[in-house]
């Protein structure tokens, strides 16, 4: 009985989020992603001032707005964002989806910022997407490059990630069962 109720609640949450997303045109969705990215970067620069120089000298970056829910044993998240090539300023619109297991109840609104040290890492992210699994403790990796990526977690060679919650930069990054991929609808011009 409890599983049936939980399943119905999760389906309802998913359907409501799809209805809310479906109202915007592709142009409106692109503009929302741009505004979200600008605001998120401004917030990050206030919380981690060294991040601005790191992003400025990077090959590129990606910014995502994510909403996660955890209901008893099931956790899910979905989001959208934009990746930018720092040299060419080319924008690529992307999506994120995540699923996992873990005990808890709640909703988490958070932002994820990827910083790509080199073109190879950026191109791999853009062309192959990215799948994350596991957890990383940001405090354990904060000292590389004389603090250039202070507050970030290295998730792959040349790829650093900041996670911002309403309380600031998260000290622990969770990317379990997470997939980032291109949004084909928004990348059509």
Task: For each feature predicted by the language model, list its residue ranges.
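Bacterial N-terminal signal peptides
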Residues: 9-18
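N-terminal secretory signal peptides that target proteins for export/translocation
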Residues: 1-5
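Small-residue-enriched, tightly packed secondary-structure blocks
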Residues: 23-189
């Amino acid at each position: 009985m409890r599983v049936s109720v939980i399943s119905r609640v999760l389906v309802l949450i998913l359907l409501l989020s799809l209805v809310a997303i479906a109202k915007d045109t592709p142009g409106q969705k692109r503009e929302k992603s741009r505004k979200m990215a600008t605001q998120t970067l401004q917030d990050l620069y206030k919380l981690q001032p060294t991040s601005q120089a790191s992003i400025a000298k990077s090959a590129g970056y990606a910014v995502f707005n994510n909403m996660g829910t955890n209901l008893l044993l099931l956790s899910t998240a979905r989001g959208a964002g934009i990746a930018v090539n720092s040299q060419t300023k080319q924008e690529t619109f992307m999506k994120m989806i995540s699923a996992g297991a873990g005990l808890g109840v709640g909703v988490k609104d958070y932002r994820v910022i990827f910083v790509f040290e080199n073109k190879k890492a950026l191109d791999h992210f853009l062309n192959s997407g990215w799948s994350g699994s596991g957890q990383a403790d940001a405090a354990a990796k904060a000292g590389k490059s004389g603090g250039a990526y202070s507050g970030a977690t290295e998730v792959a060679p040349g790829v650093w990630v900041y996670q911002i919650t309403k309380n600031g930069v998260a000290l622990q990054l969770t990317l379990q069962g997470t997939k980032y991929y291109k949004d084909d609808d928004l990348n059509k011009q």
